[in-house]
Amino acid sequence: MCISKEDEEDPSRNRRNQSPLSLPQTLKHFQKDLLAGAVMGGVVHTIVAPIERAKLLLQTQESNIAIVGDEGHAGKRRFKGMFDFIFRTVREEGVLSLWRGNGSSVLRYYPSVALNFSLKDLYRSILRNSSSQENHIFSGALANFMAGSAAGCTALIVVYPLDIAHTRLAADIGKPEARQFRGIHHFLSTIHKKDGVRGIYRGLPASLHGVIIHRGLYFGGFDTVKEIFSEDTKPELALWKRWGLAQAVTTSAGLASYPLDTVRRRIMMQSGMEHPMYRSTLDCWKKIYRSEGLASFYRGALSNMFRSTGSAAILVFYDEVKRFLNWGGI
C-alpha cells in the first residue's frame, strides 16, 4: 500500500476511509511521532509546572511529614487550595520555588510524552491490522482505548524513577536547608540506600491502575471523538473544534482517574519512611476513606482541571508539530 502525499502531510486525517498502515510503514513514522511528542511535552509542562506542584501538594499533604509532622517535627499549616499554596510558597520560599521538581518533571516528560504518542499510534496500528475485514474486535473506540492504555503503561514503567522523584521533590517544602532532598540524584541515591530498587518503584502497581484508565480515555477518547466529528468531505477538524474536544476529553479523563492518582501519590510518599502509613494499595484506599472522607480522593482536582489545559494543548498541537515535521522533510 502506498501513502499519498496529502495523507503524509495531514496526520489528523480521518482514518475511517483508509486502509490500515502496514507494520513497516508504522515503524517508519515512529521516530517522527517520538520527536513531535517530546517537543510538545517539555514546553507545555514547564508552563503549567506551578499548578502541577499545587495539585501534588494538595493530594499528598495528609501523608507529607513536612506538613503533618512527626516526632521532632512540629509540622506546618495545611494548604487550603491552589491559590493559598501559590501565595504562601512565593512569600516563604520565593517565586522560583513554584517550579521546584520541574527539572525531574521535564526529564520525565520528554521521554514519557514522546513514548506515549509514538507507542499509541504504533499499538493502534498493530491492533487494527490484527483485525480482518470481517472481524473488527480491535477497531474503532476499543482499539483507541487499548492502544492509549498500553502506551501509557509502557511509558510509565520506563520513566517511573523520574516520576516518583518528581512527586517527592515537588512535595518537599520549606527553605533549602530544611528540605529532605537536594535534587533528583540525591533523592534516588537516598531511597536506594534505604529501600533498594523496591523503594524507587514503590507505588508502581497503583500507578498502572490509574494509567490504564487515564491514558485510555485521554488518548483513546480524543482519537475517537476526532473520528466521530470529522466529515468525509473535510476530514480535518478546525483547530478550535479540536481544542474544545481535547479540553473535554482531558478534563473527563482527569476526573475519572483522579482518585487512583491520589492513592498512587500517597504511596509514593512512603519511600524511605521507617514506619509507612499504608501497608498496601487497598489499605491506602481504606484509610483515606475512613479518616479523611470521600472528598479527600479529589483534593487538588480543581488545580488539575486548570492544569488539563496544558494536556489539551499537547493533544491539539501534537498534530501541528507532526505536520511541521512533514513539511520540513524531517
From Swiss-Prot:
One Pfam family it belongs to: Mito_carr
GO biological process per UniProt: anther development; mitochondrial ADP transmembrane transport; mitochondrial ATP transmembrane transport
Claim: Repeat is one of the keywords in the record: yes
Gene3D superfamilies reported in the protein's UniProt record: Mitochondrial carrier domain (1.50.40.10)
Residues spanning the membrane: 27-61, 103-127, 137-171, 203-230, 236-270, 300-325
Motif Substrate recognition positions after renumbering to this chain: 264-269
InterPro entries reported for this sequence: ADT_euk_type, Mit_carrier, Mitochondrial_sb/sol_carrier, Mt_carrier_dom_sf
Coiled coil stretches, renumbered: none
Catalytic activities: ADP(in) + ATP(out) = ADP(out) + ATP(in)
Keywords: Antiport, Membrane, Repeat, Transmembrane, Transmembrane helix, Transport
Membrane topology category: Multi-pass membrane protein
Record field: compositional bias (Acidic residues): 1-10
Principal location listed in the UniProt entry: membrane
Region (Disordered): 1-22
The keyword Transmembrane is assigned to this record: yes
Binding positions for ADP per the UniProt entry: R108, K120, R264
GO molecular function: ATP transmembrane transporter activity; ATP:ADP antiporter activity
Compartments in which it is found: Membrane
Domain of life: Eukaryota
Family: Belongs to the mitochondrial carrier (TC 2.A.29) family.
Known role: ADP:ATP antiporter that catalyzes the exchange of ADP and ATP across the membrane.
General remark: The transmembrane helices are not perpendicular to the plane of the membrane, but cross the membrane at an angle. At least 2 of the odd-numbered transmembrane helices exhibit a sharp kink, due to the presence of a conserved proline residue.
UniProt subunit comment: Monomer.
Protein name according to UniProt: Probable ADP,ATP carrier protein At5g56450
Lineage: Eukaryota, Viridiplantae, Streptophyta, Embryophyta, Tracheophyta
